[in-house]
Every structure is written in C-alpha cells, then in structure tokens.
C-alpha cells in the first residue's frame, strides 16, 4: 500500500514538471518571434552603406570613358583617311592644272602655225622677186617687216614650247609625218626616209600637234 502511494506521488510530480515546462515554452516562444521580427524590421529599415552609391556612379563613368575613347579613336582614323584622300585629290588636281597650263594653248598655237606659213612664203617671194626700181624700197621695208614678224612669231613659239619640224633625211614616222607621195631615191638618199617636206610639222612640248606633209624616197621600181 505504501509502495503504491509513493509511485502515485512520483507520477504526479513528473506530470506537474512536464506541464510547467510546456507552459514556460509557450511563454518564451512569442517573445522569441517578436524579437526576431523586430530585428528583421530594424535591419530592413536601415539605410544602405554610404560607399555603395559612389561605387556604382564611378563604374558608370568608367564605362562611359571607355566608350568615348573608342569613339575618339574611330574619329581620329576617319580624319586621317579624309586627310589622305584630300591630299591625293590635291595632287591629281595640281597635275590636271599643270597639264591644262601646258596644253591649254594647243588650239591657239595650231592656228598661229597657218599664219606663220603665210608670212614665211610671203617673205620668200618678196626677197626673190625682181621688181621695178621705184618699188624696191617699199618692198624692202615690207620684207624687213615680214622678217621681223616671222622672227617674233618664232620667239613666241619657242617661249610657249612650240617647235617646228623639218624632217628632211629622217626616217618616215606615221606619228609625225603625213605621207603625200613617194619619190625615187636620189643620190645619197636612203629609201624609207623623208626626201622632201611639203609642209612643216609642229610639236608642242614634245607632243605633235600637226603632222609634217612629206614625200618619202623609195627605190625606182617601187615608185607610185
């Protein structure tokens, strides 16, 4: 009987102890949750660190600087190419201007050649003709004037690079000579060379502007 009473008392003590522990846990749990919740709210309400903002701004500036540097390099390359193209255009234009300056008077010189032919023939006729005594002085003056005019024209031609071609004895060249006819080769005349010049040719700075009208010597059996 006493043993049963002791067992009942011990069991009651264990039940009371377990109930007290459960109750204490119930009281502690709400306080723990509230503490955690308050700590979380406090952490979330705090401002971000001061160094975070400037770091992002600095990174953005660096990226922008790299982009601008690439653009500068690209523009510099384009500028260099443009300068090179302009220099090439300037050189080509300069060559064209020089060519125009040299050969721009080609047509003018070609027209003057006809005048030179007339003056030369007139001067030759006046010097060889037999005229009456009363006209001799006048003809002498005319001849002197024509001679001076011819000399002046030759001086102008030389100044502008106009050269007269009298290719007697030269080998026939279709780029410089206009073949009028063939004639038998005389003594000392090589076949295929110019035997007679009907009309002188002219060159302007080495470029033929008028072919010389010539007769070319050939062997007797090949006469045309």
Curated annotation (Swiss-Prot):
Family as reported in the entry's similarity comment: Belongs to the GrpE family.
Gene3D superfamilies given in the database record: 3.90.20.20, Head domain of nucleotide exchange factor GrpE (2.30.22.10)
Transit peptide limits: 1-31
Tissue specificity field: Ubiquitous.
Function field: Essential component of the PAM complex, a complex required for the translocation of transit peptide-containing proteins from the inner membrane into the mitochondrial matrix in an ATP-dependent manner. Seems to control the nucleotide-dependent binding of mitochondrial HSP70 to substrate proteins. Stimulates ATPase activity of mt-HSP70. May also serve to modulate the interconversion of oligomeric (inactive) and monomeric (active) forms of mt-HSP70.
InterPro entries: GrpE (IPR000740), GrpE_coiled_coil (IPR013805), GrpE_head (IPR009012)
SUPFAM superfamilies listed in its UniProt record: Coiled-coil domain of nucleotide exchange factor GrpE, Head domain of nucleotide exchange factor GrpE
Quaternary structure note: Probable component of the PAM complex at least composed of a mitochondrial HSP70 protein, GRPEL1 or GRPEL2, TIMM44, TIMM16/PAM16 and TIMM14/DNAJC19.
Protein name: GrpE protein homolog 2, mitochondrial
GO CC, one annotated term: mitochondrial inner membrane
Upper lineage: Eukaryota, Metazoa, Chordata, Craniata, Vertebrata
GO molecular function, one term: protein homodimerization activity
Gene Ontology biological process terms, A to Z: protein folding
Protein species of origin: Mus musculus (Mouse)
List of residues that carry N6-acetyllysine: 141
CDD domains assigned: GrpE
Keywords: Acetylation, Chaperone, Mitochondrion, Transit peptide
UniProt keyword annotation of Nuclease present: no
Compartments where located: Mitochondrion matrix
Broad class of where this protein is predominantly found: mitochondrion
HAMAP family from the UniProt entry: GrpE
């Amino acid at each position: 009987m006493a043993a049963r009473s002791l067992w009942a008392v011990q069991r009651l003590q264990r039940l009371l102890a377990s109930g007290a522990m459960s109750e204490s846990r119930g009281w502690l749990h709400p306080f723990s949750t509230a503490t955690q919740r308050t700590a979380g709210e406090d952490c979330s309400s705090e401002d971000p660190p001061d160094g975070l903002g400037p770091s992002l701004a600095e990174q953005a500036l660096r990226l922008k600087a790299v982009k601008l540097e690439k653009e500068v390099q690209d523009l510099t390359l384009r500028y260099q190419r443009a300068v090179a193209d302009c220099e090439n255009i300037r050189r080509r234009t300069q060559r064209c201007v020089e060519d125009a300056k040299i050969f721009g008077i080609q047509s003018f010189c070609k027209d003057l050649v006809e005048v030179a032919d007339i003056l030369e023939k007139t001067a030759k006729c006046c010097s060889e003709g037999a005229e009456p005594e009363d006209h001799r002085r006048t003809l002498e003056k005319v001849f002197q004037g024509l001679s001076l005019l011819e000399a002046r024209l030759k001086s102008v031609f030389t100044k502008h690079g106009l050269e007269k071609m009298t290719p007697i004895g030269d080998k026939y060249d279709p780029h410089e000579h206009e073949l009028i006819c063939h004639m038998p080769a005389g003594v000392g005349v090589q076949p295929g060379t110019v035997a007679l010049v009907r009309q002188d040719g002219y060159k302007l700075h080495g470029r033929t502007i008028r072919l010389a009208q010539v007769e070319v010597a050939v062997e007797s059996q090949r006469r045309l």
